[in-house]
């Protein structure tokens, strides 16, 4: 009997457990299996009557994309122009030796590089306009924007930072738009007056101060200043900055390639013109550095075919590749929707060659050797462009718009530019646009065949100058003009 009691006790101990290291038994529930409803092949919708399907919405789509013979006749591809007109660069240009000092300039600031009045120019400039509902904005809205701009705190933070995502740079600390007049061509969508520029992922910046509510910060990049969302930037210390600057630079040559970390998690999309610090070269990828939202320096991977180490000399292969990508772009006023306008297209095009250009059109037109078109007629302008212009190294400038000279084709001067539309004017004087809305290669007579073409605004007739940005500047008398983004 004693033996059986001992055995029973032993079994109880074994089954129930008595040691301190044993864990309680956990019974795992079998997860429920959820499946979506089955689709039924039928012409009868199962949606309730109060839901309007997209195809049932009755709207009249404006027919503004008229036929433009330039874009049909001339190749909308880089190969013909590169093969005919481009040369492989033999020696480094002086401008290419100064890329680093321009690119990293924001990290050298100890305080804001301009005064508060200059930074806050927009407060007095914008006191009326239309909002997202196309209704006039009340004066109280502008007063609130002035209050939120908090320029009493200008240059109070004085911190070096970096962009952790692609950002829209705004004139006011708000994502809401401001239109001059939605009823007039060129004064409504997409020309949001508050879209100042954009900031690339991992781009160096300097933080001046925060908005009154703290949701926005006023920053300086190497090419612009304005408001960005505070949660899109992080502050860096001196050790981090020096660590990033010491690395070789990786120049991105592809758009919209997913960049992932070592765990294959998405970090950002690639963008032509983006620069990343290089860590290592692997079999298929470049390993580069980025800063995450906690301010920690981490690694991501870039496919080898989407970047190159250091800036390259201007060459036909690279021109072909970059230009082909950029010709796919739709028009993006001030970088809206992560697209490009005229000046950002040219700026990004030349960045992989280690050439730094300013952001706005008027400033770009002052880089390098400037040749004025004052007192020249159209025939003389064409002759001068053919004589002096260097394909892919020359900018043609009219007020508010820049075009990259890509040489001649069938004896015509050809330009690559990202353009919103062709100006029109009917017999009653009503102005309009034939929407192009993308990057194109055209002559300087683009749109001359369009109905009601406004000949007074033809590209060739309105050209003011040309500048070879790879050549050293020469002193000339030039009228100062405040730069504006293009809305051609």
Regions found by a protein language model. Name each.
Residues 38-73, 77, 413, 418, ...:
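Low-complexity, Gly/Ser/Thr/Pro-rich intrinsically disordered linker/tail segments
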Residues 192, 262-263, 305-310, 328-337, ...:
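Second-shell loop/turn segments in exported
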Residues 15-17:
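C-terminal motif of bacterial Sec signal peptides marking the signal peptidase cleavage site
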Residues 25-170, 174-176, 180-181, 187-190, ...:
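Boundary regions of SH3-family modules and the immediately adjacent low-complexity/disordered segments
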Residues 19-21:
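Bacterial signal peptide processing site
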Residues 186-211, 264-282:
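Conserved beta-strand/loop element in small beta-rich adapter and peptidoglycan-binding domains
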